[in-house]
């Protein structure tokens, strides 16, 4: 009842019973009762009750008149507080809002029906509450509105509050006494409000009961724990039961168990866990009989067989000869259905995997019961000591045990699948957990900026499409910005987009450009129904991160005569386009579209029937995104997945991942996230892990040696000063890292690429690679090869600590294999590794350092790196091998004429250009990187697991979680990573794609590209040559590159190849060749800055600057002078005396750059300079001592500097052992290796000509002197000794010098004249091996080579391969002249046989002397094999040589020289002596022409041992 319905105002106008009696209406009522109107049909008692009700509740009908005391108070209040009435009205408005909220709640609760279609505990609860709950809101609202109206009326009438009598008629003014909602509510007697006193009392009682109950439970548990128990198992009966159980177990079948290697060893490879493909078997694993499913009876004796599943009770009647595989498939399906319905569990199936077969003849005879269980090939047979075998038939149903006859009544009744089943009703529960992240991750935020108007809305991504509202494109002439979980993209012109409206609905489908990464296509769409409960799913695109949001659920109802449906979920402006999702099945029902003007109802556009098949999943849309090969399901990951993907065993991490807001307890120290606070655009924070900025620089500072040298040498300082200061230490600070990382935050421009031409460019590049010899690549799964290619000095990863060298220090081969397998599994499953971001500590140009620009490095973690190398290493290695043959230089060496080949590959007379690219790694779009993935997949072997790994790897490369130094894990959406396994190769391919795309866009056919443009790429470096007729190409390249997002300029054009800069080098002409040269300033920076930790490292750095300076003659001369000065300082002079100071001769540098040998003329000129100061009286009586002492006036020639000092620099050598002083030899044979850095000595009293085995002759000339001729850089420059700096003089006394040759030699003479030419002897230093008679002369060796090549009928190139195999075969089997038959060489896994006879027929003098020519190479080959793993030739194994350091000498054609160590010489001689012991060489064979008929005069008795031996009492006779 509504108390406001009680009449009050006009009651005084009602006629009383007394008045009615006067008018003739006789009423049996009290005269004072008033009747509103008289109707004779109404009973009199009703009039009486109405009046009694009015009288009893007249106070409830309104506010009534105010008593005089209250009126005075109110009047005083109104006079003193002018804001009392507005404040009271504000309180009444608040109460009205509260009551209307309650009223909406009651209406929503009562709108839920408990029908059969919506029967749940929730609906039952709501129905009960709606039945018993009382709604006072309507009455309260009426009271509040009346009070508010009366107050406003009083205010509008402007009544003077000083007259209390005027106030008494306004009862609502009682509210001005109260200043709170509770006070006003109590004054107006509003119903349905909480009684806080009663609530407090009930809560106190409940807490007391809860505490008492907890105490009772605790007391019960405490008493239970104190209760004493005893074991009852150790008694006779229990022991008897255990014996019975053991006996029962003994009757069970037994199975052979072992690891793969053991099983393969005993039974064959078919029993390993590789799979059930047929493999080799051996021993008991080989079976001669056929596999049968039934045995011991004839199935044809029975009419049919009934198969029974003991778990489900289902039966199947079939022919006795039915294929058992079909039966097994049938019952597997039945059991899967039961599993899905939770009627059985997997444990049931594991404990009872078999079925039972009943072979039945007729219904009156006994049936044959047979147990069928899955076949186990390793089960031990019951009757024989062997295994069951047949591993290819594993898990197939087969008879187990002997068949048993059973009575007909024991046969189960038929229970075929599909019979009618009746199930019990179960209670309906609330719906369980549901993951809405797949929907939230597909939501995009769309901004359409057209002129000055900007519209913001949401959309839903599906493949290459976005579904959104049509009213987004009220204007379609602007720029569309798309913010998604893929990143931030920009479409410059919305008119280029293809749009498909959904007829009659506020829905439109946008087809994205082809270079937009596709979304996952896992969403489900359907039409809504009235029974659905819906929620609103959204994504909160913040500046620094993206998070998912979800609303409460709401009912939904259709709007008449439209395709809109209404919902009651609160929304805001800009929420249009968010998906409405059904909580019943997770399907998307529509997109939020409209709201009414009062924001009390919202509307969404519903999807039509078959929306997905009609508009989304058609063939045209599938073809639109088919070129995308990366995994779209692994793109929209966030913090939750990152924590789930934390590496597990065998990887061991030492840092934990946390959420961004996961720190509930913290120290009150100020923590600044200096990077996270600046994130924007395509960089989003997804997590946190401990990190710090490494500011320790590898460059320690300025080199004090170099500074001291310049301070003490003014002329040299004038030379070096202009070249110094151009390079500085890179800045390692927070701002530098933020500046470099924020390059990745720029939006990705899509729609600018001509995708048709770009896809054509990909096909052209693939065809080019095939034509150049690029073949199929493999996935490298060999752990040894993977680990050998790792940089063990690098860090393990962001979540790890230490270097790889320490992490894998004690790891076995099996553990390494497990690491590779685990990494591949993570990659296959799409688990992300956390990459480490850091700043590069290096020398950078001064301008970039002043601008605080430092390059960052993003390193792959070990858990991703190993699997990544499995996928990319073989492709990369083949890529390196084709350098310069294809348009790239990756893998080439700039030395040995490599740079000359590069520049000469650019045609002469063309227009050249070195393109300048900037911000390359951060500007690469996902579309470009996906093209690289397509190229790689085109050449990889077919392996579905490998393809998935490779796709996931490149998905992780694009969408990378990077652990930054401030502790934030950042997700990027574009660009390449500098620390991924194939950065250079991928960058090179992308630049090649850009060049091919540009030429195709310019209209040139692929067959004409090389005729008009030649180019080479290395990473982001690009050098081009264009035919003069097509010079205009340069004007268009920048535009086409920018379409792909690449920032390149092509303005530095030239006609001179020497002006080209490529990879920071330019080519200068030297001795007819182009040699690579760095900037002089960059070379001087090596001297200027010190990063070495040991003195020897500093010397190596100076030598490195010498290598780079060759070609700058003046600079090289000054560096050699500096190096010579350094070797005189401590502690470098001690290193020099110990032979540890590296030194590089001029001839070595010439060989390194030009790959040309030093001429004998150059060497002779050096020797002439060495002996040019000998006097005439020494003409015949001269010997050579190596004291190297000179007169004061003699000139000293030093290869280290043009000025003479006492420091001597010998030539380069490949061995650390010097020749004896009594021997001065020069060996000119070619070595297998040619090192640059070699020991040098600075002892002033000894000069030795080392025994060199390099191809570089010794050099005694002054290197880099400006007076030398260009074509004879090793010419001798005679310089006078500076007597003021003579190390041989002390004070005014001169130390006497010995002559190099003395006249006291006794020479052989004829007729009193010496018969030897000492001048020739001084120059005659032949190689020791050339004179040795253990090596065949060169003419014999050449004759042998030609004869063998002719007999084998092969070419010189084929012969070079055969000789490799012959040398290795002879290392193993020796070079004995008694060998015969065939010798073998391996071609992969195949043996190739060659006859030995031609080798021996042409070998003069002996085959061993021929093979002595291969001694040096064989020694190096054995050393190489030992570097890979322990290797001992068969020759050493037979002699039981245990020292592997001597393995290089363990072959019988080893050639001993004076450089052979004494220990090695002794070991080789001992092995040779052991091999030749008891060997007999017969001078004559058996003469077949001599007669053998003669009389045998020997006499033997029965006591003789045999016919050739006499015996006398056990003793041998003579």
Swiss-Prot record:
GO cellular component: host cell nucleus; viral capsid
Residue span of region Disordered: 1239-1272
Active site positions: 471, 506, 576
Listed Gene3D superfamilies: 3.30.70.270, Trypsin-like serine proteases
GO biological process: DNA-templated transcription; proteolysis; viral RNA genome replication
Ranges of Low complexity composition bias in the record: 1239-1258
A single GO molecular function term of this UniProt record: structural molecule activity
Residue numbers bearing the O-(5'-phospho-RNA)-tyrosine modification: 295
Site feature (Cleavage) residues: 179-180, 232-233, 425-426, 668-669, 1186-1187
Record InterPro entries: DNA/RNA_pol_sf, Peptidase_S1_PA, Peptidase_S1_PA_chymotrypsin, Poty_coat, Potyv_NIa-pro_dom, PP_Potyviridae, Rev_trsase/Diguanyl_cyclase, RNA-dir_pol_C
Keywords: Capsid protein, Covalent protein-RNA linkage, Host nucleus, Host-virus interaction, Hydrolase, Nucleotide-binding, Nucleotidyltransferase, Phosphoprotein, Protease, RNA-directed RNA polymerase, Thiol protease, Transferase, Viral RNA replication, Virion
EC number of the protein: 3.6.4.-, 3.4.22.44, 2.7.7.48
Disulfide bridge partners, by residue number: none
Residue ranges constituting the RdRp catalytic domain according to the UniProt record: 910-1034
Annotated ranges, domain Peptidase C4: 426-644
Reaction catalysis annotation: Hydrolyzes glutaminyl bonds, and activity is further restricted by preferences for the amino acids in P6 - P1' that vary with the species of potyvirus, e.g. Glu-Xaa-Xaa-Tyr-Xaa-Gln-|-(Ser or Gly) for the enzyme from tobacco etch virus. The natural substrate is the viral polyprotein, but other proteins and oligopeptides containing the appropriate consensus sequence are also cleaved; RNA(n) + a ribonucleoside 5'-triphosphate = RNA(n+1) + diphosphate
Position of sequence motif Nuclear localization signal: 273-280
Similarity-based family: Belongs to the potyviridae genome polyprotein family.
Identification of the protein by name: Genome polyprotein
Origin species: Plum pox potyvirus (strain El amar)
